[in-house]
Amino acid sequence: MYSDKKNILQLVALLEAHGITKVVLCPGSRNAPIVHTLSTHPGFTCYAMTDERSAGYFAIGLALNGGHPAAVCCTSGTALLNLHPAVAEAYYQNIPLVVISADRPAAWIGQMAGQTLPQPGVFQTLVKKSVNLPEIQTEEDEWYCNRLVNEALLETNHHGKGPVHINIPISEPLFQFTVESLPEVRVITRYQGLNVYDRDYNDLIERLNRYQKRMIIVGQMNLIYLFEKRHTKLLYKHFVWLTEHIGNQTVPGIPVKNFDAALYAMPEEKTGQMTPELLITYGGHVVSKRLKKYLRQHPPKEHWHVSADGEVVDLYGSLTTVIEMDPFEFLEKIAPLLDNRVPEYPRVWENYCKTIPEPEFGYSEMSAIGALIKALPESCALHLANSSVIRYAQLYQVPSTIEVCCNRGTSGIEGSLSTAVGYAAGSDKLNFIVIGDLSFFYDMNALWNINVRPNLRILLLNNGGGEIFHTLPGLDMSGTSHKYITAVHKTSAKGWAEERGFLYQRVENEEQLAEAMKTFTQPEAMEQPVLMEVFSNKNKDARILKDYYHQLKQK
């Protein structure tokens, strides 16, 4: 029988799955549940050692002899510090050593409890990875614990070998051994490049061709990649391709971009048909919360993430494989190896998303964004600020010749204007930025800048506060919290824009918007930068948006 502590069960199951079966066990009470579970399991070869200093070096010997990682497990407190010399040796000798330390719960560190000291990160730069496991209470805790253990174990042999540290807080009671078997756990594997002569490579292609419902999601990418026509034809027909405007030209063929609205409108009985069996991802951040929620609630059987750095990124909670290589090289490598069967799944998604109409909003900040996108000149740069702007822009089709930029690394409201000004300063094309009032006024010193050029045009959406907060489900602002949450204001950019040499346009209705947009989007160079300030009512904007989504549900 094994310990009932779920974080211990995850750890032991993953040690076995990753082939780490030689473990040095040191005495103690806090680590007794770990020791009992490891020593009871027939898949592990356990070695008893009393002195942690010697135990660490003994484990190094085990790892050196077999070439595979070995583990050493100790109790809490100074027992862990006694492993420090061995950890240093393993680091500088590039030996895959897994240090497992039991710990008190975080609440008792520094409270005069016995055998306690701050254990997470204690080895600092002498380990390749250090993780502190959660005590599992929820499904999210279990996913997090599983991911952390996978990350640590994968790092023992990633860009060279070396030691890692796994710290496990364990609450009392400690000695409840009531579990009969280890759980089935998700094992994350990593391929460092794909070589056609590797056996593992063949297994990957076999798994790829096993699935008929294959989806590729492309996150933010600030580049253009033109696939060869032969690869485009092969890749496009075998996968559903989803991306957003910030994915830019990094997809073979024409991707589905209105999936967020499609997911909102999708009836529950259709979700099974639309859920992928295999999900492949590359690129950076994805904006759509609906897509993340959908794939977390309806996980694929496998999720492969392809990136040059090979980091474990589990956005959808179902990651099974990390492929460390350039994503475009990966796609072109697998293209000729796809089987000849053309699945129906991509057409199912495309046909469904074609039924979602592009919105026709009344005068609002959404209609202003739509008016700009429809009037943009070819081959310009479009900068989208965060919060509502980046989301509303996704409701419209942006021509593929237009480069789309957005600060989605941290998705904050600060710096969007400064980034666009800096980009335009080094650009030879027109640069348009769409920005909300809070983002603009927060970053207004971006215009206090001698490097602002005439190729910059700013569409400022001013509805007197943070409109997006009016659309958040479950947020009740009927009381006094309204003015604090939405940052209500009565500020205009007119004086500041004119002071900084901008041509200023004020818009308060649909007719003025249409007229001002002609000047704002003219492709010819102008003598000064332009700022168009569109005023709207945030309550009305929120109502118009809710009505649009309500109509989608009625389809």
UniProtKB/Swiss-Prot annotation:
Binds 1 thiamine pyrophosphate per subunit. It catalyses: isochorismate + 2-oxoglutarate + H(+) = 5-enolpyruvoyl-6-hydroxy-2-succinyl-cyclohex-3-ene-1-carboxylate + CO2. It is an enzyme of class 2 (transferase). InterPro entries: MenaQ_synth_MenD, MenD_middle, THDP-binding, Thiamin_PyroP_enz_TPP-bd_dom, TPP_enzyme_TPP-bd. Its cofactor is Mg(2+); Mn(2+); thiamine diphosphate. One of its GO terms (molecular function) is thiamine pyrophosphate binding. Pathway: Quinol/quinone metabolism; 1,4-dihydroxy-2-naphthoate biosynthesis; 1,4-dihydroxy-2-naphthoate from chorismate: step 2/7; Quinol/quinone metabolism; menaquinone biosynthesis. Its EC number is 2.2.1.9. One of its GO terms (biological process) is menaquinone biosynthetic process. Keywords: Magnesium, Manganese, Menaquinone biosynthesis, Metal-binding, Thiamine pyrophosphate, Transferase. Catalyzes the thiamine diphosphate-dependent decarboxylation of 2-oxoglutarate and the subsequent addition of the resulting succinic semialdehyde-thiamine pyrophosphate anion to isochorismate to yield 2-succinyl-5-enolpyruvyl-6-hydroxy-3-cyclohexene-1-carboxylate (SEPHCHC). HAMAP family: MenD. Belongs to the TPP enzyme family. MenD subfamily. Homodimer. This is 2-succinyl-5-enolpyruvyl-6-hydroxy-3-cyclohexene-1-carboxylate synthase. It comes from Bacteroides thetaiotaomicron (strain ATCC 29148 / DSM 2079 / JCM 5827 / CCUG 10774 / NCTC 10582 / VPI-5482 / E50).
